[in-house]
Swiss-Prot record:
One GO process term, biological-process aspect: cytoplasmic translation
Superkingdom of the source species: Eukaryota
Record-stated family: Belongs to the eukaryotic ribosomal protein eL15 family.
GO molecular function: RNA binding; structural constituent of ribosome
Keyword set, alphabetical order: Ribonucleoprotein, Ribosomal protein
Region of interest: Disordered: 70-90, 172-197
Cellular-component GO terms for this entry: cytosolic large ribosomal subunit; extracellular matrix
Name of the protein described by the UniProt record: Large ribosomal subunit protein eL15
Length: 205
């Protein structure tokens, strides 16, 4: 096995003494850094390379922390509006995963870069920490590389905001193959559930 294979197997045993100590020390370090900052190199090189990272010009890695837990609804001044049944504020769950949220925030922070992928690096009781791989689409090293110049096309602008990254595709429920298995996710899961569970009585004429 190569070195990256050993690293991959090491991260499968996160409860081992060595990995627990390593994650605890790194978590203390990440807590004292800004919320979103550029990393000098990937923390998990094996994972980053599997997701498309190369140690060449044009590739950037950003580390970001996202607060764990449910999502509070934005209600200015406490004015929820509507019926009391829909006045929920605290117990709402986000429809996307936190990795997709992390990609979105980094993408807004670096509008001149394209988000390629992301991966988990750490977590504690309050935050989850992710590293996001970004590509400089205006760099000649990327534009001249046939393996990566597809991301330079205008259609891939802010792909993280439109659910086109790996985390976004998973949040949309499109991780399945075949025509019938993902059919219930369009136009949305909520619309499909409503259509299949609403009893309609047509008026007798």
């Amino acid at each position: 096995m190569g070195a990256y294979k050993y690293l991959q197997e090491l991260y499968k045993k996160k409860q081992s003494d060595a990995v627990r100590f390593l994650l605890r020390v790194r978590c203390w370090e990440y807590r004292n850094l800004p919320v979103c900052h550029r990393a000098s190199h990937p923390t998990r090189v094996d994972k980053a390379r599997r997701l498309g990272y190369k140690a060449t010009q044009g590739f950037v890695v950003y580390r970001i922390r996202v607060r764990r837990g449910g999502r509070k609804r934005q209600v200015p001044g406490g004015r929820t509006g509507g019926k009391p049944k829909t006045h929920g504020v605290n117990e709402l769950k986000p429809s996307r995963n936190l990795r997709s949220v992390a990609e979105e925030r980094v993408g807004r922070r670096c509008p001149n870069l394209r988000v390629l992928n992301s991966y988990w690096v750490n977590q504690d009781s309050t935050y989850k920490y992710y590293e996001v791989i970004l590509v400089d689409n205006s760099h000649n090293a990327i534009r001249n590389d046939p393996r990566y110049n597809w991301i330079c096309k205008p259609v891939h602008k802010h792909r993280e905001l439109r659910g086109l990254t790996s985390a976004g595709i998973k949040a949309r429920g499109l991780r399945r193959k075949g025509t019938h298995r993902a059919s219930k996710t369009r136009p949305s899961r909520q619309a499909n559930y409503k259509r299949r569970n609403t009893v309609v009585f047509h008026r007798y004429r």
